[in-house]
């Protein structure tokens, strides 16, 4: 059955799924052979779903990335990590629930896992602050990463946040400073760091745990300097232009792969990760093990040098003179 709540462009799929369920119910309640009709409808639903999700606009991908049933950091950890033990606190009196972390095993290797954590419903989202971490969350994350560095544990981070919390108290506690320290100190880590955007990666809140040797993204995740709504409000003073901003910001995996920002875009199951979370978990685990195996062949200095070079190469631009200007010159 479809996962609820449903997105606007998924409604044609809902009608097909309802028809499929009605036929299944008919088969259970009677001896009528409906195998052929069921196969035809399931095949049609699969084709429709694939067609819809292959043609998603950037604005629609944002809706998928924000889907409340999309697998979260803890969901993925539970899928493929054995013996996970959560670690708490920034040692300054805070234990932010919007950014969680701990140690566990990926296969036969001990690793540190940390990431943003959203809730499934209003109550959970309030407790998790909708995945928007405070300064205490980023300081906790850095404390755990330093712990991993000390014990030579590879670091796996999972990004899923609209941005760092921008409330008055967060600013008073040094939100900008906390993120800046993370950016600085992550470049000095001597262990492999792999970051994965599993939902939405927004602004400095994403970068605070995103300085990595490899940056992965799911197919329908987004990674952006600012939310399209905020961008539209700033540029056009009209949040209704968010779809235009989403297209201009180049927030999709395909765009960011072409720009050299991300290293790999992970395919999602037909309909997105919320339709088949276990399949998404298998895809992510395979990618993490593959990239981790490659990074573990590098020395500590090679890791740091490559990480520095990777980020220094970002943001370069090319100028192309128009023919008209060239003629004038």
Swiss-Prot record:
This is Acetyl-coenzyme A carboxylase carboxyl transferase subunit alpha. PANTHER family: ACETYL-COENZYME A CARBOXYLASE CARBOXYL TRANSFERASE SUBUNIT ALPHA, ACETYL-COENZYME A CARBOXYLASE CARBOXYL TRANSFERASE SUBUNIT ALPHA, CHLOROPLASTIC. It comes from Synechococcus sp. (strain CC9902). It is an enzyme of class 2 (transferase). The lineage of its organism: Bacteria, Bacillati, Cyanobacteriota, Cyanophyceae, Synechococcales. InterPro entries: Acetyl_CoA_COase_a_su (IPR001095), ClpP/crotonase-like_dom_sf (IPR029045), COA_CT_C (IPR011763). It holds the Pfam family ACCA. It catalyses: N(6)-carboxybiotinyl-L-lysyl-[protein] + acetyl-CoA = N(6)-biotinyl-L-lysyl-[protein] + malonyl-CoA. One of its GO terms (cellular component) is acetyl-CoA carboxylase complex.
